[in-house]
């Protein structure tokens, strides 16, 4: 376990440095890194500080958060098919962003789009908790999340269908594909408190998630407050997923696939999977973001498209291996 964590941490650092040096400009890696710490305000220094550094930081923050949220959600529901968007936060955040684009709020305010997405995420969480009720179990939480997610998706489609501005509709579609391009340090400071707060909350649930592997009755016998655990899970996941969707758009499969890949390596304890999934999620999103810039540098290839193209076949392969092992 210790060796695995060291290896994952080293990969995060290496990919972070690589992300800082990859771009359309033909500049040597040593020059790029030197420009980052330059006291001046030259073109390369501005590119490093205002474009590449925020992008690299967001890949680590968002990828790590989604991986952690996915592991926590799977541990709580005791379902390896669970993922962070199951409680409807990402769909609600997307609806808020779509409304901001369609009404012109995104164009009139610098942070209008991410703030509207965060407002949508908070509204979605409130509705999910209201529907699930204070005493509802995990099944009630899933059903409430599916209902809110379906409603938000339907309203998003309605806004797209009725949008009088074809350019706004086009912007909405491209935003929903997910991207870290054209992000600044403002976006980093916007998502950071939500991601850190959500991560801190989810990491405290490790002992409770371990107890849940024995069943809800056994966990309650061991002194676990399941209602409190569910509330903390929803709040932590909502902070991470809402902030990530607000800044980067819809990025899927990280919270679903990464815990699957790492679970055989860390064992059956959900608490041990939390940290590993956070590092694994950061690695996966950094790799995807680097691939976006390398594969088609002249085209605006969207990050969410790459994560889906890689994550879906990988997930199918994991399902096939699991089914084969049970045969």
Question: How would you name each of these model-derived features?
Answer:
Residues 1-327:
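Alpha-helical transmembrane segments in inner-membrane proteins
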């Amino acid at each position: 376990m210790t060796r695995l964590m060291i290896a994952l941490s080293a990969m995060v650092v290496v990919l972070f440095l690589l992300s800082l040096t990859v771009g359309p400009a033909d500049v040597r890696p040593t020059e790029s890194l030197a420009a980052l710490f330059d006291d001046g305000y030259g073109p390369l220094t501005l590119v490093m500080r205002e474009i590449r550094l925020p992008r690299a930081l967001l890949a680590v923050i968002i990828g790590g958060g989604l991986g952690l949220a996915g592991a926590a959600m799977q541990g709580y529901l005791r379902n390896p098919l669970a993922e962070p968007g199951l409680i409807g936060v990402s769909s609600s955040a997307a609806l808020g962003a779509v409304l901001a684009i369609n009404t012109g709020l995104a164009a009139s305010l610098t942070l209008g789009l991410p703030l509207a997405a965060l407002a949508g995420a908070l509204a979605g969480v409130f509705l999910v908790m209201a529907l699930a009720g204070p005493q509802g179990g995990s099944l009630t939480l899933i059903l409430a999340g599916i209902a809110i997610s379906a409603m938000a998706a339907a309203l998003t489609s309605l806004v797209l269908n009725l949008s009088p501005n074809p350019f706004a509709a086009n912007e909405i579609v491209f935003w929903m594909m997910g991207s870290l391009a054209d992000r600044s340090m403002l976006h980093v400071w916007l998502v950071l408190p939500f991601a850190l707060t959500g991560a801190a909350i989810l990491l405290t649930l490790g002992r409770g998630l371990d107890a849940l592997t024995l069943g809800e009755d056994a966990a309650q016998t061991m002194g676990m407050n399941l209602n409190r655990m569910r509330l903390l899970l929803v709040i932590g996941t909502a902070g991470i997923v809402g902030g990530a969707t607000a800044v980067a758009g819809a990025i899927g499969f990280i919270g679903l696939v990464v815990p699957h890949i790492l679970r055989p390596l860390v064992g059956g304890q959900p608490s041990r999977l939390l940290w590993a999934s956070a590092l694994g999620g950061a690695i996966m999103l950094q790799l995807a973001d680097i691939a976006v810039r390398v594969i088609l540098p002249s085209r605006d290839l969207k990050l969410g498209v790459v994560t889906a193209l890689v994550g879906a076949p990988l997930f199918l392969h994991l399902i096939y291996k699991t089914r084969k092992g049970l045969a």
